[in-house]
């Protein structure tokens, strides 16, 4: 639907509104933070280490520059819970996550430690996330699936982010 007066695409605005959540309510402290370049653009990602589409998305995210990515490990598969928890017990959780999602390298730490996995599962459920991966832009717009890096770049431009 287009408003004739100024040719504004009302359908696109409605679509963004209906597929958005409040970015400020995301508990970023429960995510693994990785910064590339100046980190000025932001994304939140919900990802399961045993999800093949999450692995594809991770490869696409590696192509982006000047971005801060907050990865909420959303262990929705039973076999993902233990390694997801152990990621946070490693000296460098970001590196442990990268090795787990990209290479399938299991975390080596065997000690129990505080981790946000149960909170992340509850958060995902409260947001109505039914699968992985999910990409959330800093304006709250969310997209499901392994989104190509070129699409993410285009969406940043279209959304004015």
Please place each PLM-identified region on the residue numbering:
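Extracytoplasmic thiol/disulfide redox context detector
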Residues: 1-85, 99-102, 106-132, 152-161
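Short, hinge-like loop/turn segments at secondary-structure boundaries
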Residues: 86-90
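Conserved, helical-rich catalytic subdomain that frames metal- and/or nucleotide-binding sites
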Residues: 94-98
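A short, hydrophobic beta-strand/beta-hairpin element that forms part of a small beta-sheet core
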Residues: 124, 131-144
């Amino acid at each position: 639907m287009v408003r004739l007066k100024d040719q504004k695409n009302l359908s696109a605005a409605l679509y963004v509104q209906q597929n958005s959540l409040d970015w400020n309510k995301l508990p970023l402290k429960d995510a693994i933070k990785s910064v590339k370049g100046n980190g000025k653009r932001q994304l939140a990602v919900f990802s399961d280490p045993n999800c093949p589409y999450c692995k594809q998305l991770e490869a696409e995210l590696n192509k982006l520059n000047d971005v801060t990515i907050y990865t909420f490990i959303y262990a929705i598969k039973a076999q993902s819970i233990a390694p997801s928890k152990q990621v946070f017990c490693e000296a460098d959780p970001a590196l442990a996550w990268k090795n787990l999602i990209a290479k399938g390298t299991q975390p080596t730490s065997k000690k129990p430690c505080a981790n946000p996995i149960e909170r992340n599962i509850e958060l995902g459920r409260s947001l109505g996330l039914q699968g992985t991966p999910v990409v959330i832009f800093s304006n709250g717009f969310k997209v499901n699936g392994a989104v190509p890096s070129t699409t993410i770049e285009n969406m940043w431009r279209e959304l004015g982010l």
